[in-house]
């Protein structure tokens, strides 16, 4: 029987260099990360997703890779990596890593060989044109920062394609040699103990755009089947988590019959979730949940609030996007790429823990696998003085002491500045203070994670949206193996109540609530405080 561990997983995303510095050089490392696994264990994490940790010039937070088979020396050694994997395993945590193979760094030896010699075997590993292509600005990913998707290389005397920054030349994934190398990279890290990959930029990875070939690509998604087949052969329980900002209509091509991507991030639902939060009504999120297709096979959606990138609102209408900007980032400096916000969750709510807790409870109640960005569990803010998406990647705030407990290095040697001023500074927001106090934000989130882990109905089961006649409430019913959990969330800033008109419910047992007196009134009415939430198990303990 397949090990579908991801169905009830709690995924925690870590940028290693910003998490914990063990050797005092100012950059987080694998030894430091291993030393802080107890924090993740207290939170209830079962899977750690690592942002790129490979050798890199680090012009794009490590997503510009110069060696796929190594560790950035500032982060440690392969030995440190394996020790971290074992330490995580001892705590029941799996590890998945970023697979960034749409492009390389322009400093990668493959690209250096390709540009130096038109007869190099690596020349066709990239996408070249002798003449300047038409529409070199068509399809820019980073408006306002990126100037084109083709650049001229003087050494090669040719144009190369880069869907992202010009220092990230695209690999030619129609080349069988490139595809074989991708499988080799996967096999290497699987052998070192990882449990799968978060696959970066999947729509661009499989897109044959710009490639000149006599054999047109009939189905670009077939590449995903190749990757899945290799993964299943090497490590059957490993997963593929796709970063794919796609419509629901496109989703079946990514899941297929369970033989492509294991999970896909629900970007559509994420944007509708924030539109709901901005408007104070559950209606947009309710509509997206109703429209979201059920993955075939054993596929799963991955759900999230924030991540290491901008909050991408590009799929909303201009009016809807402006509503989100007005609610969560009215200053133009908070906005980015004409489509998103470069803010962390806590600062978007101005530190309002009532609304933050409701948002986290909502995340964990959504059908799918929840993904948490490091630091959000303690309510960290962002540093808007940093460029672009770097604003949300500041070092983890561990304590109120020097450098927030992140590093003993001098302040000017830190990989990124710590937030040391204002209400979100490490003097006020840190893990040490919160873990010591049972009524802290961290413990509230840990309690929610515990409720989610004890509710496989949410991860495994089918979900039904219950109509209680109020657009400001989202009430979900999740069923699995004869058990049922009902979750309710109030998007309004005023108290709400509702009745469950269901003859199959004989008893409701509160699992989680923001109310100190419990959500169930004497007449069976369920009451929610402003921005309140509750989780209820139907008919007693889970059987």
Feature roles, as predicted:
Residues 1-543:
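Active-site and adjacent substrate-binding regions of carbohydrate-active enzymes
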